[in-house]
Amino acid sequence: PPQAAASESRRFRLETAETAKQNAELFAWRDIDNTSLGLWEREQPVLVYNHGEVVNENIPASDHRRARGCYIHPVWGLNGEILTDDFPRDHYHHHGIFWAWPHVGIDGQEHDLWMYDTIKQRFVRWLHRDTGPVASSLAVENGWFVDDRQVMIERVSLRIFKASDDARVIDISLTWIPMAQAITLQGAEDKSYGGLTIRFAPGSRQETVITVPDGRTEQDLPDTPLAWADLTTRFGGAESASGAA
């Protein structure tokens, strides 16, 4: 709006209708199959949200870790390299970007969502899906179920920004609402795992660098509060290093 005696100049940019249309088509959500929804920035894959149950047939049927849902994988770097892993042999239960706790207390009983043996996350409904010239967004409602009884409402919101020359920002917002009874969440004692987690894809161990606010580190740092942590390596034989923080 016009201002009287403005103290500074303002600049505006006008775009043709065709340019605006091209920007609006920057992102695209596409169904991969009946369990997975993928996001592309133009022709570059960005990530996949697995809303249905993903099953690894190579894991014995008696092992409850052979199936999981409600997580993000793969996540691609800016050069097409895959940054995340799923069903790694050393920890079958790890799955891309996920959120889980080894100690979930309900009605005096403890469940392990980290290993998902007596409690699991399941898709309930879509809340929102959109694309735009700057970012794309997705919102979904899941449930935590003990057998067939839902004990928790889980709402996941993703906002994925268009890539810059050397980075991409992905915002993840998580909300939990107990259905009836109080629920307690606790991580693993003396090990620090539990909560929002990312399982990185295999990279060059010799070239892997972990950086925290105090600088580079080679320590595990259990039970250490960190505002952020960065892992950088050369994934899958890529020509250059990349990573995430």
Q: Which role does the model predict for each range below?
A:
Residues 33-50:
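Mature N-terminal segment immediately following signal peptide/propeptide cleavage
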Residues 1-26, 49-141:
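Alpha-mannosidase-like glycoside hydrolase catalytic domains involved in N-glycan trimming
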